[in-house]
Amino acid sequence: MILRETTMKTALITGATSGIGRATATRFANENINLILCGRRQEELDTLNNELGKLVKIHTLNFDVRSNEHVQKAISSLPEDFKHIDILINNAGNAHGLDPIQTG
C-alpha cells in the first residue's frame, strides 16, 4: 500500500490559462495541490478559478512575466496562506530566460 503525503502542497503556474499550463493546473487540482495561477487574460483565470476552485484553494495573479516589476509586485501581493510555494511550473510562452541565472 502506498501512503500519500497528507500535507497540502502549493504550486505556482505561469502561463496557466491555456495549453500545457492549463492541463498542469487541472492535473494538480485533481491531485489536491493548491494553485497560484498566473496569466495575462483575467477572464481565463476567472474561468479556471470557477472550474478548479471546487477541488482546491486557488489564487489568481493577472500579470505579464516579461515585466520584472510586475512579477515582483504580483508575488509580493500573495496572501499569507499562499506564500510557501512547493512547486514552480515556469510555463509562460514569452519567458525566454535570456539573462544569466544570477540576474534573471
Predicted regions and their residues:
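Conserved glycine-rich cofactor-binding loop
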Residues: 17-18
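Aromatic pocket-lining residues of Rossmann-like dinucleotide-binding sites
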Residues: 28
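N-terminal Rossmann-fold NAD(P) dinucleotide-binding loop
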Residues: 21-22
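The beta1-alpha1 cofactor-binding region of Rossmann-like NAD(H)/NADP(H)-dependent oxidoreductases
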Residues: 63-73
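Conserved glycine-rich Rossmann-like NAD(P)H-binding loop of the short-chain dehydrogenase/reductase
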Residues: 33-47
